[in-house]
Design a protein with these regions (language model features):
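Glycine-rich phosphate-binding loop signature in dinucleotide/nucleotide-binding domains
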Residues: 90-97, 201-202, 291, 377
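A nucleotide-sugar donor-handling region in carbohydrate enzymes
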Residues: 47-51, 70, 148-222, 334
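Catalytic binding pocket for nucleotide-activated donors in carbohydrate/polymer assembly enzymes
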Residues: 308-343, 347-349
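Conserved nucleotide-sugar phosphate-binding/catalytic loop shared by glycosyltransferases and other
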Residues: 33-79
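Active-site and donor-binding regions of nucleotide-sugar-utilizing enzymes
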Residues: 5-8, 13-31, 55-56, 68-167
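Donor-nucleotide binding loops and adjacent catalytic segments primarily
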Residues: 36, 54, 191-291
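A donor-sugar binding/catalytic signature common to diverse glycosyltransferases
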Residues: 101-102, 113, 124, 152, ...
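Leloir-type glycosyltransferase catalytic cores
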Residues: 57, 158, 332-380
Length: 380
């Protein structure tokens, strides 16, 4: 038997760890006489809206966290330090054989550092992704975590090459596919059937917007440039904007509130305009994304999900650590340039957008491959 600590800190982490936990449960059920995996789910609480987290745990059929830190907000250094201190204590207490971290958030970095100093093996899910932009905090997190990890599970062959160029030995790199797509493919039909109230929206008759990165929402000049593009686009179609609490705060602070229409029911989205709503659960968001004409985002995971769904995506960033979504998928980088955002949006609205294909091994079986490798490496 192997004892594993699974770390999550933000909502995107939940979609990545859920398939791995589900697979561990399947393995244990199939080997009832000899339990293979003992795991604990550690939630650092890096995303501090408990209601938002609860929605995702429920939709993804995940058990509640075994350990919750409640770290909440703070600077990058404050969050990282607090998590390291708490996670080190958990490692001393639980004595895990392996720690699984996912993605590139501060929780990923903090738990990796604490784990490595105790000489406990680390498995990094989504290893090798690079934007080559060190002004992004996530890039620093990715690079350090990969250096410290014993098992690097990658989503694409580009990531393998990035790791090799950085001197990571080949025997630590494993191309397994994309776990967030495991969740998407598993729950897509369930989301469609459960979220019937959203079906009053006409399919492909609206744009879905997400915007949360500090480089976009904390900079008034950049936010205004994006905002002015949204106003132009919203003159011809509905833009649905499930806004993170922090983004809503910056909208008010910058005085951008007036053109946003706060809507309590999705039945009113037939109207043109920018419709600001509270954050959604996983099923609701997945349904909206799947049926959108276009998605505007600065998220990383959404670039991947839209590629698999075949939904055009415009990424409001100057670079991406997921270039495969551009080379093979439906994604286009538009940055924060107003004219480019408007031009590419109208191209898609006029049915002239790019089409893509599903990348290699994005087939819903990444978590199976990950656990097969762990079983082999630990001689289980």
């Amino acid at each position: 038997m192997i004892k594993i600590l699974c770390v999550v800190g933000t909502r995107p982490n939940f979609m990545k760890i859920a398939p791995i936990i589900n697979q561990m449960e399947k393995y244990n059920s199939a080997h009832s006489l000899k339990k293979i995996f003992e795991y604990l789910l550690v939630h650092t609480g890096q995303h501090y809206d408990d209601n938002m987290s609860d929605y995702f745990f429920k939709d993804l059929q995940m058990p509640p966290p075994d350990i919750y830190f409640g770290i909440s907000s703070g600077t990058h250094s404050e969050q990282t330090a607090k998590i390291m201190i708490k996670f080190e204590k958990i490692c001393f207490q639980e004595k895990p054989d392996l720690v699984i971290v996912v993605g590139d958030v501060n929780s990923t970095l903090a738990c990796s550092i604490a784990t490595a100093k105790l000489l406990i093996p680390i498995a990094h899910v989504e290893a090798g992704l690079r934007s080559f932009d060190k002004t992004m905090p996530e890039e620093i997190n990715r690079m350090i975590t990969d250096t410290l990890s014993e098992y690097l599970f990658t989503t694409c062959r580009d990531a393998n090459e990035n790791l090799k160029k950085e001197g990571i030995p080949k025997n630590r790199i494993f191309f397994v596919g994309n776990v967030i797509i495991d969740s998407l493919l598993k729950y897509k039909e369930l989301a469609d059937s459960k979220v019937k109230n959203l079906n009053k929206l006409k399919n492909k008759d609206y744009i879905l917007l997400t915007l949360h990165r500090p480089c976009n929402v904390d900079n008034k000049k950049i936010f205004r440039e994006i905002f002015e593009a949204l106003i132009e686009i919203s003159k011809v179609t509905s833009i649905i904007f499930p806004a993170h609490p922090r983004t809503q705060k910056m909208i008010k602070e910058f005085g951008f509130s007036c053109p946003f229409q706060k809507i309590l029911t999705l039945n009113l989205f037939q109207m043109k305009g920018i419709h600001l709503i509270s954050p959604l659960g996983y099923f609701e968001f997945l349904n909206l994304m799947d049926n959108a004409k276009l998605v505007l985002t600065d998220s990383g995971g959404i670039q991947e999900e839209t590629t698999v769904l075949g939904v055009p995506c415009l990424t409001l960033r100057e670079n991406t650590e997921r270039p495969i979504t551009i080379k093979e998928g439906t994604n286009i980088l538009v940055g924060s340039n107003k004219d480019k955002i408007i031009k590419e949006s109208f191209t898609i609205l006029n049915d002239r957008g790019k089409t893509g294909k599903i990348p290699e091994l994005w087939d819903g079986k990444a978590s199976q491959r990950i656990l097969s490798i762990i079983i082999s490496k630990f001689n289980l």
